Amino acid sequence: MDKYFYNEASAQKLGWEPSWFGCSRFNDDLIEAIVEYQKSKGLTADGLCGPGTYRRIYTDRQETIHKFKPNTKNNTDSFIVYNSEYFDIDWPKVKLWFEGDGFKQRKGFKRVFEKREPNFFVCHWDVCLSSESCFNVLQNRGLSVHFLIDNDGTIYQTMDINDVAYHAGSRTWNNNSIGVEISNAYYPKHQGWYKRNVGEERPLITDAVVHGKRLKPFTGFY
């Protein structure tokens, strides 16, 4: 068997990189590194990163994902995580689930080992006062989203984008989407809370029409 070809095909299908094994190329060094990893986990040491080996190293990376966060000069760059890899994002306020003040999804989602390729976003209006409140509501209901956007614009990522969040009802929608909850309590009666806790009231939407029906005034976005 051509082990180079096998590992390249496996990486393309499953979504892993030689760097997961401490290597930079698909070569003999990678095969040897895979063998050593397999030995350490009690797996068949054949140097091939098949589904079994991939699941083990994927899980290991998920458990220690904080160790792989890229180093930056001023430590101000922001990242999101997809398939155990970091991607930079042009936004100053991003919190990942493993950081001290982040929100970690503990139930209500499905771990996916093969690389998932979501092709659309589902954005929800959470009808909660804050992302923390929304996260707690979702956890209590056994539901989840990948991202929450708070009142101050902070983006909270609660899980790897590659995992399936339970947020859109149908399995078809969930399997192919990224779920986002945008903080907004909706009802004008909460304006006092925003004034006290955020510093200003939200704008009011007073002329919205949906399916030919005029809606009562509701809070918009900052």
What are these regions (language model features)?
Residues 88-222:
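Active-site-adjacent loop/helix surface patches within enzyme catalytic domains
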Residues 1-100:
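Cell-envelope/ECM-targeting effectors and their regulatory/trafficking segments
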